[in-house]
Amino acid sequence: MDYVNRNLDDKLLCGICGKYFSDDESLREHRRQRHMTCHMCLLCNRRIPENETLREHMKNKHNIWKLFICVCCNWSFGTEIYLKCHEECMKSTGRPGLLKPLAMPMTAPAREASALNTDPQNGSDDVPHSSPSPVPMIAENSIIQASSLKMEPIESADRSSASTSTPRTLVSGTPREKIPCGFCGKDFFHEGSLREHRRRFHMTGHTCLLCNRQIPENETVRDHMKSQHNIKKVYNCLCCNWTFLNQVHLISHKTCLKQTGKPCCRPGHMEPLAIPRTASIRQFFTLKTETQSGDDDSAAGSQLFSARLSCKSCGKFFYSERSLSKHHRQIHMSGHVCVLCNHQMPKTVTVQEHMEKEHNIRLVFNCRCCNWSFATRRCLMSHVECLKKAGDARNVKPVAIPRMAADSILQSLKESEAQEYPDFSAASTTSSGPASTLKTPRMDFKKNLKICTDAVQILVGNGLFSNEQLAQTETWVMIFSNANKLFHSMNSFGEPSVSRDIPM
C-alpha cells in the first residue's frame, strides 16, 4: 500500500487528489488539512461527523480516554506500543502490518481496510504484490520484545467468526475479554478504564441512608455526616464506595464481599451510612428477613429505615442510641437555665454574661462537678461539702443550672426548704393580695437588686469595719442583716441618711 507515489522528477504525489509536492512536510500538511477531516471508527463501524473529534467519540462511545495517532497516515491506536509497531512496519515494508487501528481516515481506500483482515501471503486482487515478502509478525517485532509485552498467538478466522459476539481485536483474529460495568452495563477492555469510568460517572453522588436524602456533589459524605448527624468519623470501602460507621462493620462488609461476591446488609448489622447514588437498595441489600412477595425498592427501604432512631426535638435520624443521646445532650441540652428569672440561656450566652446583664451580678462561681452556678463562694463551698457528705446538693440554691436537668431540679428546689435569697418581690407587692407576688416584672427585680446593692455599699463605704473585720464571716452576716433593714427603709421612704451608729 503506497501512500506516496514518486514520479520520475522526484516529486511527491498525493494519492487522493493527484497534487504534487516538493517535500514531505508539505504533503503531510496537505493531507492533514484536506483529506484527514473525517474518520471511520472501526469499533462500531460508524462515520465520525466533522463537528465531533475523534477523541470525543472514543471517550463518549467507547470510554477510551487516550489515543495515539500516526502523524503520517493519521491512523489511531490504543497504546503507544501499537503505534510504534505500526510505524516500524511502515518503514520496513511500506505496509501497516497486522495491527488493526481504532479509527482511520474516511479518505483511505477500501483496499486498505480490507487488507487488515486479509492474509497478505494468500494473495489478493486488491493488494498486488509481486513476491510473497514476509510481513513482520507482532511477536517478532523488536519494539514489543523490548517492552516485554505478552501477546496471544494469532488464531484462525474460523474461530473468531464462530464466536457469538464480536469483541474488539488488537491483533487480527485475537479476541479481547470485556469487563462489564455493574452499574450501567458498558463493556471495557481494561480494569483501569472501568475504574476511571466508575469514579467519574457513578461515584459522584451518594444517598444518605439515615435521612434518605441525596448528598449533592459539592458536599462530601464526611461533611454531611458531621453536620447533619453529628458523626465525626466514617469509614469508606474502596471497592464499592459504601460508607460505614466503624471499622468493624467495614471489615465485615469486605469479608462478605469476598465470600459471596456482593455486599450484604442486615438491619442493625453491617448497615452502611451512605451508598453511591446509582446503587439500588433492592439490588445490593440482602436483608435478614426476606419479603414474602415481590416487593419494590420502597418496601425494602421502609424495612431498612424502620430500625433508625429519630430525635423527638428536631426529627433527625441516627444510627445508634449513643449518637442520639450525644446529639440530644450537645444540641438540645446545651446551655443553662436561670433560677432567678427562669430564662433559658442559649449555648452562645454564658452564665456570667446573663447574670451581669439581667441581674447585675458581676461574679458567679461554677461547680466543676455538676456545672451549677452560685452567687457567692460560700454557697459554692457549701454545695461542694454537701456533695461530698450526702451526695445531694439541693440544700443550696444556685443562680443557674444546666438545661438538661432543669425540670427535675427546679421542681425539687421549689418543694424543699432550701436557702432562700432575700424576697425582693415582697417590697413591690400591692394590695391585690399574695397572688400578685408570684409573678414580678423583671424591671422591679432589677430595681430592688440595685437598692440592696447600694445599701451594702453604703455600709461598707462608711468605714465602720476594718480590713480584719471584713475578712471574717460574722461581719458580712451583720452587714447583710443591716442592709436588709436599709433595703426596706429605702423602698418605703426613699434614700435615708445613714448614721454611723449602727447596732452591732
From Swiss-Prot:
Disruption phenotype: Superficially wild-type, with a normal brood size, but drastic reduction in brood size when grown at a permissive temperature of 20 degrees Celsius in an mpk-1 mutant background. Double mutant mpk-1;pzf-1 shows meiotic chromosome non-disjunction, increased embryonic lethality and also an abnormal male:hermaphrodite ratio, at 23 degrees Celsius. Coiled coil: none annotated. GO terms for cellular component: nucleus. Keywords: LIM domain, Metal-binding, Repeat, Transcription, Transcription regulation, Zinc, Zinc-finger. Expressed in proximal gonad. GO terms for molecular function: DNA-binding transcription factor activity, RNA polymerase II-specific; sequence-specific DNA binding; zinc ion binding. InterPro entries: Znf_C2H2_type, Znf_LIM. It comes from the Eukaryota. A zinc finger (C2H2-type) spans 12-35, 39-62, 68-91, 179-202, 206-229, 235-258, 309-332, 365-389. SMART domains: ZnF_C2H2. Residues 159-172 have a biased composition (Polar residues). One of its GO terms (biological process) is meiotic chromosome segregation. Residues 115-136, 154-173 are annotated as: Disordered. PROSITE patterns: LIM_DOMAIN_1 (PS00478), ZINC_FINGER_C2H2_1 (PS00028), ZINC_FINGER_C2H2_2 (PS50157). Possible transcriptional regulator. Involved in promoting segregation of chromosomes during meiosis, perhaps acting downstream of the let-60 RAS / mpk-1 MAPK signaling pathway. This is Paired zinc finger protein 1. It comes from Caenorhabditis elegans.
